[in-house]
Amino acid sequence: MADKFHILLLNGPNINMLGTREPDKYGTLSLAEIVNRLTSEAAALNVSLDHLQSNAEYALIDRIHQAKDNVDYILINPAAFAHTSVAIRDALLAVNIPFIEIHLSNVHAREPFRQHSYLSDVAAGVICGLGADGYSYALQTAVKRLSQSH
């Protein structure tokens, strides 16, 4: 049976360092552990999940552009690009695919420069401060919204 929906998971700079990078803020799970868990959850929901992590803004933008005709929903942890990248915002708007912005830490309880996101006001939703569970909540929400609209 074919997958019902296609979800794209994008992770921005330094997310590849999860598990060892400031575990008090970002938790102890590695990115591979998070992606493996989410891939299993997606399979149980009968949806496909593609993943890209990049420290390069252009690579994330290129993958967003490639998603235009074959992805139903995007889950994105833009990491520091949330606070700096008009280009990622423009790419997301250009493809017109609904997306949920995810942050492991509560960005609103951190430094002032982390409290503004160029993506939040155009996102379908924002999840922050719930650690790795935020990815699961985003996936569940995306599938629920897609199921309701199809």
Swiss-Prot record:
Give the reaction(s) catalysed.
Answer: 3-dehydroquinate = 3-dehydroshikimate + H2O
- The molecule here is called 3-dehydroquinate dehydratase
What EC number(s) does its UniProt record assign?
4.2.1.10
Under the heading InterPro entries, the entry gives: DHquinase_II, DHquinase_II_CS, DHquinase_II_sf
List UniProt keywords, sorted A-Z: Amino-acid biosynthesis, Aromatic amino acid biosynthesis, Lyase
**Could you give a single Gene Ontology term from the biological process aspect?**
aromatic amino acid family biosynthetic process
Chain positions of site Transition state stabilizer = R21
Name the source's superkingdom. Answer: Bacteria
Q: Which residues form the active site?
A: Y26 (proton acceptor), H103 (proton donor)
Is DNA damage one of the keywords? no
Say if the entry is tagged with keyword Amino-acid biosynthesis. Answer: yes
Q: Matching PROSITE patterns, A to Z?
A: DEHYDROQUINASE_II
Which Gene Ontology molecular-function terms are recorded?
A: 3-dehydroquinate dehydratase activity
Q: How does it associate, per the subunit comment? A: Homododecamer.
Q: In which pathway does it act?
A: Metabolic intermediate biosynthesis; chorismate biosynthesis; chorismate from D-erythrose 4-phosphate and phosphoenolpyruvate: step 3/7
Q: Which residues take part in binding substrate?
A: N77, H83, D90, L104, S105, R114
Organism of provenance: Klebsiella pneumoniae (strain 342)
Its function, per the record, reads: Catalyzes a trans-dehydration via an enolate intermediate.
Query: In which family does this protein belong, per the annotation?
Result: Belongs to the type-II 3-dehydroquinase family.
Report the SUPFAM superfamilies cross-referenced here: Type II 3-dehydroquinate dehydratase (SSF52304)
